Amino acid sequence: MANKVKYGLSNCYYAVYDETAGTYGTPVAMPGAVNLSLDQEGDTNKFRADNIDYYVSISNNGYSGDLELALVPDSFRTDVMGETVDSTSGLQYEVADANPKAFALLFQFEGDDHATRHVLYYCKASRPTLASQTTEETIEPVTETINLTATAIIKTVGGASKPLVKAKCKPTDTAYSTFFTAVQLPAAT
């Protein structure tokens, strides 16, 4: 049965992409996923002739938006954002000229019939927000947000190079059971 609706966000992971080897590291959990909101990027171009839209082209430039977490894990800050932990003092510090690494983002949406697992293959992130507030009569958690850009990455699929942006699978698909143990790539067209 197909889902009629989707809701929820869980099982959020990142997997660092090795630009030289063209491979992904093992996915690392990012617990505390609150919200994922990504807008499509791209343009629609219309060529007018004969008083009609004679030719229409649509570009797919991926997605951009926000991932909100209870707290951004320290592992993400070091693995992806380039923060460093001082071996003597234990201080974890941010370096102004650090170059964030590319990564795959894996996550799951629930549905009325089944969960659907998603992967964005080539993401870049900006530094997380830094904020908090005083405690009043009740404790109100303050979340952290990462701005994301997800674009295409060239991978071989069925013997041909294809610009992959994202993929998804449902429980009946072969990739589902091992989805969060390694970044799943399509094998054939």
Language-model regions, residue ranges each:
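Repeat-unit-sized solenoid/scaffold elements
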Residues: 1-5, 80-83, 94-108, 134-149, ...
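Short amphipathic beta-strand/extended segments with alternating polar/hydrophobic composition
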Residues: 25-31, 117-123, 164-170
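Mixed-charge, glycine-accented linear interaction segment located at domain edges/termini
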Residues: 125-189
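Solvent-exposed edge beta-strands and adjacent loop segments
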Residues: 2-77, 125-143
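Short linear sequence motifs
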Residues: 7, 40, 47, 96, ...
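Structured, beta-strand-rich domain cores
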Residues: 55-57, 61-121
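Serine/threonine-rich low-complexity intrinsically disordered regions
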Residues: 18, 43, 86, 172-173
